[in-house]
């Protein structure tokens, strides 16, 4: 979580919508971290829990901290502070994700080995995210409410085929809650690489397959912006 928040500051310093002359406030990282912790504490109070952990979904609470600590150029103002902040957060997730898990772009670029009449059949390159993508492609979707209990969130995350498997493969020593946090991170990471879709609406983050998400938006006559889609 700390690395993601720190990365937001780095992304802001190179973003085309952020005013380079005014710079990025040194307090952005501190303010954002405090906001994320506050979101987690609020959820614990709602459910009468004595402790909880900061989830990736709690980072939705750092948006005001980001918008309050950066100055935008004219194009950024036209885009909207909220959208710029979401974009920075998404780029942060995208950048950090590949330091923990295989790069989805590399997976997309893999080509099947060429067949030869005399050579034995070669095994297809493994796609570590195939099971996850297939689960969503089958019409499944996952709703993670911002205020849901830790236990309920963990149950929901384990419903996604292949999600625990990839975390266990790369972090075999992770405990239950740490694994669940990494599982949530995988979903956000895959959405940042357009493997699955993600949108926030009505106090929840909904993960879906890319095609189904586009069809639903088309049926309702609305575009991504109407849902603050930041996948």
Regions from the PLM with identified roles:
Residues 1-54:
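Conserved AAA+ ATPase small/helical "lid" subdomain
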Residues 21, 41-231:
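C-terminal engagement/docking regions of AAA+ P-loop ATPases
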């Amino acid at each position: 979580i700390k690395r993601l928040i720190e990365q937001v500051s780095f992304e802001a310093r190179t973003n085309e919508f952020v005013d380079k002359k005014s710079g990025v406030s040194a307090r952005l990282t501190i303010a954002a971290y405090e906001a994320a912790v506050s979101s987690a504490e609020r959820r614990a109070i709602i459910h009468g829990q004595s402790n909880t952990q900061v989830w990736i979904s709690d980072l939705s609470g750092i948006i005001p901290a980001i918008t309050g600590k950066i100055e935008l150029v004219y194009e950024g103002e036209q885009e909207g502070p909220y959208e710029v902040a979401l974009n920075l957060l998404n780029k942060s997730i995208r950048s950090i994700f590949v330091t923990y898990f295989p790069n989805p772009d590399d997976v997309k670029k893999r080509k099947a080995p060429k067949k030869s009449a005399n050579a034995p059949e070669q095994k297809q390159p493994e796609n570590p995210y195939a099971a996850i993508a297939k689960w969503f492609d089958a019409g499944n979707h996952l709703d993670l409410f911002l205020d849901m209990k830790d236990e309920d969130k963990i149950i929901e995350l384990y419903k996604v085929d292949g999600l625990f498997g990839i975390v266990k493969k790369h972090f075999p020593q992770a405990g239950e809650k740490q694994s669940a946090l990494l599982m949530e991170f995988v979903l956000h990471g895959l959405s940042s690489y357009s493997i699955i879709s993600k949108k926030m609406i009505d106090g929840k983050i909904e993960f879906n397959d890319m095609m189904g998400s586009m069809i639903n938006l088309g049926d309702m006559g609305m575009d991504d912006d109407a849902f603050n889609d930041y996948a």
